[in-house]
């Protein structure tokens, strides 16, 4: 338990350089914790009530970079790389839903002196929802952003094809093909971010080629990406819960969020000109939506 050293290999060094480019100016510190026997990279910044940001599958915590500085002005932000993602190690064995919930529980034990609000995108949303359903006393609130688990995984056909091509052969071309399904205006986003976007793209491709990510997703996809969380389990979520969705999300389409909102009474805020990553694509609108959701947890 606690902080652990990170073994740097020759293969890691180019990725570490790219990671430094990603995090420059974001205003976070990085430390390594051992969580459920998994060495985990955790970004932290700010002061105030704890806010835990959980990214999606095939991603990394630095993708929250456009909203972390604003959130850190009022909250203690905790953004881990999920197991096998980013700079976090692969799990020592098959990692399914139970293992992820144990991992998240240890993250909260080591980083949050009081119950946090969990904000989860995609896979991170499915993990956060299941944790809130089973451990409501350890969570102040829940915000689901394009989350998996509210219905069986059924992306738009073009999205699914691009995702499959990238998974089978991660190259710059297949990466950009997938990114064009993820974002409404990829060229505009790249232009806004400049060199920082180059670091995002380089790091995403490098991490997709690592055995660690494949090992993690092998267990996570069947249990936390593809299936719907049973409605009775979602009914056990008692903490204030909100939904934030991109209007043009092709991965988990808006109808999924609308159905969950109607069934559970969860407020839904929709962000225009955003696909499955509103905090990256429309940070100002996402921050406004998130602050409205956070106000409901007080």
Question: Across the structure, where does each feature detected by a protein language model lie?
Answer:
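Conserved alpha/beta-hydrolase catalytic His-Asp/Glu region
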Residues: 153-158, 172-236
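Post-His helix in hydrolase/transferase enzymes
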Residues: 280-292
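Flexible "cap/lid" loop of the alpha/beta hydrolase fold
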Residues: 133, 140-172
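Alpha/beta-hydrolase fold catalytic core
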Residues: 1-51, 74-75, 112-115, 140, ...
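Conserved alpha/beta-hydrolase "nucleophile elbow" surrounding the catalytic nucleophile
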Residues: 55-57, 120-125
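Conserved HGGG/HGGXW glycine-rich cap/lid loop of the alpha/beta-hydrolase fold
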Residues: 38-87
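Conserved loop-alpha-helix segment in the C-terminal half of the alpha/beta-hydrolase fold
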Residues: 236, 240-274, 280
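Active-site loop/oxyanion-hole signature of alpha/beta-hydrolase fold enzymes
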Residues: 43, 78-119, 123, 288
């Amino acid at each position: 338990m606690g902080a652990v050293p990170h073994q740097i290999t020759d293969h890691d060094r180019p990725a570490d350089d790219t990671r430094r480019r990603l995090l420059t100016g974001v205003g976070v510190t990085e430390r390594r914790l051992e969580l459920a026997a998994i060495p985990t990279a955790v970004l932290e910044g700010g002061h105030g009530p704890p806010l835990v940001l959980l990214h999606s599958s095939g991603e990394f915590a630095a993708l929250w970079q456009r909203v972390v500085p604003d959130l850190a002005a009022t909250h203690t932000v905790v953004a881990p790389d999920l197991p096998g993602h980013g700079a976090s190690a692969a799990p020592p064995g098959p990692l399914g839903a139970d293992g992820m919930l144990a991992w998240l529980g240890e993250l909260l034990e080591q980083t949050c002196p009081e119950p946090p609000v969990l904000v989860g995108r995609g896979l991170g949303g499915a993990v956060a929802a299941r944790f809130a359903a089973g451990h409501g006393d350890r969570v102040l609130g829940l915000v689901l952003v394009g989350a998996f688990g509210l219905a069986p995984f059924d992306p738009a056909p073009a999205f699914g094809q691009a995702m499959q091509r990238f998974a089978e052969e991660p190259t710059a071309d297949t990466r950009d093909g997938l990114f064009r399904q993820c974002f409404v205006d990829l060229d505009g986003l790249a232009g806004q971010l400049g060199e920082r976007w180059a670091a995002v793209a380089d790091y995403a491709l490098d991490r997709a080629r690592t055995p660690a990510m494949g090992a993690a997703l092998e267990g996570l996809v069947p249990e936390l990406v593809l299936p719907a969380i049973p409605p009775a389990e979602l009914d056990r979520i008692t903490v204030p819960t909100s939904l934030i969705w991109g209007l043009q999300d092709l991965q988990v389409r808006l109808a999924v969020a609308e159905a969950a909102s109607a069934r559970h009474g969860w407020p839904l805020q929709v962000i225009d000109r955003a696909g499955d990553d509103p905090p990256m694509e429309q940070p100002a609108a996402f921050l406004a939506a998130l602050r409205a959701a956070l106000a409901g947890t007080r």
